Amino acid sequence: MALTKVSTGVVDMSQDTGGLVIAKGNGTDVSSGGERPTCNATILGSIRENTTENKVEVCTAGGGTPAWQFLEEAGPSFVPLTVDYLIVAGGGGSGAAGAAGSGSGGGGAGGLLTSIGSTALSLNTSTSYSITVGEGGTPVTGVTTPRYTGGDNGSDSEFSGTGITTITAIGGGGGGSGSGSGSNCNNCLPNAGGSGGGTGFAGNGAAGTAGQGNDGGISASGAPYAASGGGGAGSAGSGAPNNSTGGNGGLGLSNSITGTATLYAGGGGGSPSYNGTGTGGSGGSNIGGDGTSGLVGNNGTVNTGSGGGAGSPTTSSNSTGGAGGSGVIILRFPISYSAPTISNISPAGGLTITNSTDGTHRVMTYTCATNTTVSATLTF
């Protein structure tokens, strides 16, 4: 007969030279069709062999919520699941102008939020969290009616789940077009966002979001107007210094969550008044799209949330804006934890995942496989 329960406080096995055989089974909970009992308050202290990972695990509430944790050979048995994050939204697209129009504003960078230098998240194992990685604002192609069109905003990036405050980085604002009002206008003014879009008409750029980005710049004061740069996470977009020079995009910010300092969220450059003459504004930190005196603006760098740069129309051809760069979510946590499982990716195939290490930490990077907003569920 098998021994199923011991009623004494101590079991003396000191004379036994063999081993204690414990329960074993795969690492999937019975509630999901596996063999592992759900860890809850009634079985705290239970141990078993996880045959999926070939490790011994214990049901514990050391992290605050009952969960299975692996036993380690050395060091502390339980390492808290403390997660640093970098969340960047998609950058805004630049504006565009019709033939014989003036310059257009650069797109604002996507909002940037990070725990580096601040407070990391405390997450729980066997718990699902949702992520959304935002696409960049689509470029405005050379439309003829109406003659002036502002750029599209980038899409938000977000991390959410039970027990934490949702973290939402706001998409970058679209750049304004080469006119400010009238029947020829379609969303001509720049848009607010994580960082604000630059303006292509007399006046100020759009506002950025406090704690995430900065404002777009100011356009040249007289007609025909050169346009300003979109705001970046590190600084506001620059104003157009004169009618033949577009304003530079705002600077991005450097972040070392991966172990390597990398720039994110630069603003897009504005375009000059006239095609073929003058100079477009530079994209912020060389990751925002450059403005140009040519017809087609340059795109913001993908996976950085940077704004698109603007182009300049000729007397007979419409300009085309640059697209904003897609956003990114990066998570950093102790290497003793495996990469979270991924599910519910929408659209299917839309998420690119990179699993790397930096010393004692694992670094997970999530980006759009194409410039399309993608969502998914992570389970640690």
What feature does the model see in each segment?
Residues A2, G9-V11, G18, P66, ...:
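The right-handed parallel beta-helix/beta-solenoid scaffold, focusing on the short coil/turn
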Residues E73-G75, P80-D84:
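Short "repeat-start/strand-capping" segments in structured domains, especially the N-termini
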